[in-house]
């Protein structure tokens, strides 16, 4: 056991952790030259296209150290994006140490900080690494100071390397073996294994990634899932080298995969503990804190025949992604679908794209909303995650919206722009600290504003230099109203949105103008209105298409013309009574972009 090292890499997006992991795999000979591909561990097509890591992956490598010993390195890759921070905490729970990779040109960013604190809270050994020293803009001295100043760990002897060229990577491995402690645990005790991640394989059923804390697990053992109490047979187990390799036994301290032919998706929840049926452990390992979704949106299949396969797809995806929440929902405009909860907008996009790609579905998304806390007039507290569930205005005592605490790190010269943006988003400043040329800002901003487009706007006002980390702080009373959209005097539930009263007027106007461009012209006038309760705040009309009925009259008598025009008018009136309007998918997406271009 003393030759096992379990570690993961923490870094901000684009600081080079996937490239560094490629190099480590290469040095340890995990893959032959032919099989080496850039970003070996980003196995999802989506991950490769966007160049981000979404899912945690694991690899077991043998490293021949300079002291003549052979060490087994278990390396768990983690994502860097703010929406996937819960993935990071799961990966870290299985490790004893972490490499903190910082770009020597860019310096410390908010996300690095957040993940680094998570690692420190779990008492992991954090080893700082300065990457990209081959770049002309690299300034390792300054960045080392920043690490000490902002993160507060000793970085005087931080390793300098360039994952791209391979310089300094062997030093990283030596330092790993030296500084990161070996796993602790009792090899002869009862088995306790932590489920770090699970995913669904069409042939094998549920595959779980596990870390053995105590005891050992052999092929053919009967294992028990501690939360459900159900027993399964350990059919196959092994390690990733990144390829799946079968083994007969997983020893104490190792990280590997396990297949128990579990067909039920909820059979092995992430964060659960496995133990042996014949010699069970007394208590389960501390799991992970449940993540609360911050953003909710309705997802509906375009054709209602897809509903069943959509439900199965969501089930399989939620196994792989513990933070995805969903419940059935029906809408008069869109039929049957699901209300889904996500961690942020990127998470929502990724899930929608994965559903469309991996499961071949066509989906419509409604506008994302956050969860509001409503105190009704008879003093009940209700949580509302969709505008259609909001009680009538006269039943609401007070409406509270979620406030997010946003930590931003940015260069001084962009401070003015960022503060202006935060004020526009109804934020209040709680803290501001200068670290050299960087400024650490803390603002409390309503979650609805953060979720909408705050991240994009922050990046654009600061030319991409500012970085953001946010978490839910509390609910706060606020003057929020529901803006309904009426098309030909009928409410369309899927288009409603909840917004602050001050913004309601112009968001309503913006929305009806956008809808006017997107709804195709019909044979009759279509009135699009935005309303708060019964009070109409904005209206626009999609003009009808009409045939020139007078074309065949030539000279003709005026009464003849009047008769023809009146006949056309009556016909249009009749059409309007029975006609209904087809809304294109773009119309639903219009809400997502309300207020984005106009500012």
Swiss-Prot record:
Reaction it catalyzes: GTP + H2O = GDP + phosphate + H(+)
Matching Gene3D superfamilies: 3.30.70.240, Elongation factor 4, C-terminal domain (3.30.70.2570), Elongation Factor G (Translational Gtpase), domain 3 (3.30.70.870), P-loop containing nucleotide triphosphate hydrolases (3.40.50.300), Translation factors (2.40.30.10)
GO term, biological process aspect, one: positive regulation of translation
Entry GO CC: plasma membrane
Binding site for GTP: 14-19, 131-134
Top EC class, one word: hydrolase
Membrane-spanning intervals of the chain: none
UniProt cross-references to SUPFAM superfamilies, sorted A to Z: EF-G C-terminal domain-like, P-loop containing nucleoside triphosphate hydrolases
Purpose: Required for accurate and efficient protein synthesis under certain stress conditions. May act as a fidelity factor of the translation reaction, by catalyzing a one-codon backward translocation of tRNAs on improperly translocated ribosomes. Back-translocation proceeds from a post-translocation (POST) complex to a pre-translocation (PRE) complex, thus giving elongation factor G a second chance to translocate the tRNAs correctly. Binds to ribosomes in a GTP-dependent manner.
Record's protein name: Elongation factor 4
Source organism (scientific name): Yersinia pestis
Lineage: Bacteria, Pseudomonadati, Pseudomonadota, Gammaproteobacteria, Enterobacterales
Gene: lepA
